[in-house]
Amino acid sequence: LAGVVLGVIALLGAGLGTVPESPAQGLMESLARPQEGRSMRVTSTMRQGEIRRGAAQRMRDPQAAPRGDLDEASNWDNFRVEPGETHILMDEKGPGVITHIWMTFLGPQPQRWAPKGSANHQEMLLRMYWDDNPRPAVEAPVGDFFANCFGKRSEVISLPVIVEDADSYNCYWHMPFRKSARIEIENQSEKPISLLYYNIDWIKKERLPDDTPYFYAQYRQEYPVEKGKDYLILETQGKGHFVGAVLAVRTRSPAWFGEGDEKIYIDGETKPSIWGTGTEDYFLSAWGLKTTSTPYFGVPYFDQWGIVGGHTSAYRWHLNDPIVFNTGIKVTIEHFGWISPDENPEYKSTSWNEREDDYASVAFWYQTGPSTFSARAPHARQRRLPSLERVIVRPADNPASLRHGQGSAVAQQLDLYEDKQWLYRPSQADGAWLEIPLEVKRKEPLRLVLNMTKSYDFGRYQAFLNGVKIGPEMDFYSPKIANEEYHLLDFWPEPGTYTLRLECVGKNPQSHGYYCGIESLRLRERRPRVAQYGHDKDKDWRKNPILYH
């Protein structure tokens, strides 16, 4: 893998000069040739004369020399970016080529240096401007630009983008500019960006070839996707080559979302000359998607198969296979897949249905001259996925309403959740149970979901709703503390009070105990067409509990 990585990293900049005959020649061969230009770096390092305002913020002087004395303050190499502020990482004159960007910052969880938490990377909007153009050539949330979607941190090990250990953000896309380059991050969160470190490496050039293309990356979203139209990833006029995409999907229906094909229109054609065979096929997987990371494609985050509210993020880099266009390109993908019988007018499950899921994407491409893509990244408030929950019951918020068997129970704060979980601690399986009440105000199609904690000393439990067994046994054992949603029931509950009961039925052989941790019980909405067709409206869920997959 290392040899492939080195070879193709050289290929990333090949569009700026000559293309190596093969990746095997690649970087190692080019190092034995004269290199033109002068290496430069823009960095967050502490500089002479800079002072802090209070304990965190610092007065910036990017022209001052780096500070390297023995005072501890010389190690304050980071910035704090307050809510609503824009931090300029780079503002340099060209011509030149950016060859590498590295950055890191604290995650959103409360911790020592940020006791109230920090912005997550979906709330940080990254913009890059070339040659004093008022419109950004790059506009995307920091996370999505680095193939980390939904505000979740995931490791990515690919050629142009590497996020080591889910918190060290690296980018090797080559980004040429003639007159100037400005890179900035706007904090669109209500919390600060804490401990922002960065290094941006670039080569100052005497000149760039006249036909050198600019690097572009643009975020776009539809929550949910527009009915009757393929989802648009990129549409621009001009000459260039499409080099990759990041796609994030949050499902609103059960079953597999990804039967839709990519359809790419080249140079103004009305019918796509590039037409794929399925969403997972475009992302170079087969028979579905699963978490993986490779040099050319990957799925950094995939939580569960076929659930309502499932999350999938995927990337595909066209490094050896750029999609070349001369007058324009339009990149789309269908939003078709399986749906459950209750969403089908004929009450059957089929593989080819237009779905109504939430899509977000980042397109990556090179183009000579300005882009005409009209997409713009909305504010972080609009990028946040809308809630699908009709009812949320957090047991830790109202412990007086709870009942449990032998053992004790306590509210507990974990880094997994913004709110506390309810931790039930029985000493054995016999007599171990807990009950949680919930209120239903109107009859509508809903899905019952438990948001549970898993750990090394947790047990196995069976769920009951008003005395009716629902779902299979749930094994809450995990060698490390983790979180998982358990989907138990699709039903049309009548208005009234219900009781969810969890009974301990034993433990995993590897578990050290019988504990049970619940963050919340949720009643999740189904798509409007479930109510429109009403197939299960008058069925008694108690006689035949159903969960659609």
PLM regions with names:
Residues 2, 354, 411-414:
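Alpha-helical interaction segments
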Residues 2-15:
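Bacterial N-terminal signal peptides
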Residues 4-6, 75, 458, 487:
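Hydrophobic alpha-helical context, especially transmembrane and signal-peptide helices
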Residues 11, 91, 118, 173, ...:
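Generic marker of residues within folded, mature protein domains
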Residues 22-390:
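Beta-strand-centric surfaces of beta-sandwich/beta-rich domains
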Residues 376-549:
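Extracytoplasmic
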